[in-house]
Amino acid sequence: MSEFKSDFLHTLSERGFIHQTSDDAGLDQLFRTETVTAYIGFDPTAASLHAGGLIQIMMLHWLQATGHRPISLMGGGTGMVGDPSFKDEARQLMTPETIAANIASIKTVFSNYLRYGDGPKDALMINNADWLLGINYLEFLRDVGRHFSVNRMLSFDSVKMRLEREQSLSFLEFNYMILQAYDFVELYERTGCRLQMGGSDQWGNIVNGIDLGHRMGTPQLYALTSPLLTTASGAKMGKSLSGAVWLNPDMLGPYEFWQYWRNTEDADVARFLKLYTTLPMAEINRLSKLGGSEINEVKKVLATEVTAMLHGRAAAEQAAETARKTFEEGALAENLPSVEVPAPELESGLGLLTLLVRAGLAASNGEARRHVQGGAVRINDDQVSDERRVIGSGDVTGDGVIKLSLGKKKHLLVRPV
């Protein structure tokens, strides 16, 4: 559909969120005439979501901002199975205790983007364990399982890929798409939910839910998927050279999060402003026209706006100021990430390679050695070329810390304790 008339779909379309819908015209009409309830599922595979999942949270944010009701569905039940979609092998099964702990940790992020409550447009957080854990297997087979064609399930790309590669697909995993389809019907029965959204890799699972709803007598249900994003150079969103870009502040602080977005490739800046900030389109269009050295200022705007939504405006501005002092003034910014080292250990002397690994700037002594040999390591802004260098209490500055740097963009403070 060339142009949506409903606020929600128009907003998503102009900002680049829409990859595919099950019925452009029907869904647009639904949003123009009703307050729509829609959901996205989040499986608790880790204690935090990472930046790759932020596009889904932003879709829920815009749903509520345009007057509709979002549901963030926690996969307490489906997480016990694991989504096999486009995976080369089965996920390692998690214990119920791990799943519960991950959900408790994950859900803290959502209130930064959504308003939860009891009102008709307030967001809901629901756990599919509420209905999946109590299912009677024989009744489920009779009432739900009979509506699924194995022939059709085998035709979905996510399944076909595993089979064509002769990679094992367990019966447990094969059931995941049935459970996800059932979630859609159950959410309609409980909340009147008519739309499921997700990444484009979820298309088959979502369409299964629409078909199941049709066979079980629900009104027309709908699907909307977003593109699977990569950076301009082909890297996965939410991954950096240092690892996953976590959303939970106890797993990645505001400064490191800000830096991830500040380091966005030039070709991605305009696209990311549309997807990950709430800046008006007119302002985004203005910023997108800037080039040359001004693109770096636009990247700072991007980093600050994205960080402000997750960590709050004060933390975002503090991260920006820390970066400014570090990179533009060369000053020692007290809000840089830090690692604590026992003072007696420093007094005895700590090997540089060991410190680089402990600080998370290298994964191994071998990698640390390559960084030193490549001239990338500095202590208190002085380049270090000797991999046998020992760091001691004499390296502690008047500020009571040691500044450890890797390249131009990674800095942290070593604090004796």
UniProtKB/Swiss-Prot annotation:
Its GO CC terms?
cytosol
Family affiliation: Belongs to the class-I aminoacyl-tRNA synthetase family. TyrS type 1 subfamily.
Organism (species): Rhizobium meliloti (strain 1021)
Entry's EC annotation: 6.1.1.1
Where along this sequence does the record place binding of L-tyrosine?
A: Y39, Y176, Q180
Transmembrane spans: none
Binding-site residues for ATP, renumbered to this chain: K239
Q: What binding partners and quaternary form does the record give?
A: Homodimer.
What GO MF terms are annotated?
A: ATP binding; RNA binding; tyrosine-tRNA ligase activity
Q: Does the keyword Glycoprotein apply?
A: no
Instruction: Report which reactions are catalysed by this protein.
Output: tRNA(Tyr) + L-tyrosine + ATP = L-tyrosyl-tRNA(Tyr) + AMP + diphosphate + H(+)
The record's section on CDD domains has: S4, TyrRS_core
Domain (S4 RNA-binding) spans 350-417
Q: Which GO terms describe its biological process?
A: tyrosyl-tRNA aminoacylation
Motif 'KMSKS' region covers 236-240
Record's keyword terms, sorted: Aminoacyl-tRNA synthetase, ATP-binding, Cytoplasm, Ligase, Nucleotide-binding, Protein biosynthesis, RNA-binding
What job does this protein perform? Catalyzes the attachment of tyrosine to tRNA(Tyr) in a two-step reaction: tyrosine is first activated by ATP to form Tyr-AMP and then transferred to the acceptor end of tRNA(Tyr).
Q: Where is this motif: 'HIGH' region?
A: 44-53
Which InterPro entries does the UniProt record give? aa-tRNA-synth_I_CS, aa-tRNA-synth_Ic, Rossmann-like_a/b/a_fold, S4_RNA-bd_sf, SYY-like_C, Tyr-tRNA-ligase, Tyr-tRNA-ligase_bac-type, Tyr-tRNA-ligase_bac_1
Major place of residence: cytoplasm
Q: What class of enzyme is it?
A: ligase
Protein name (record): Tyrosine--tRNA ligase
Q: Where in the cell is it found?
A: Cytoplasm
Source species, domain of life: Bacteria
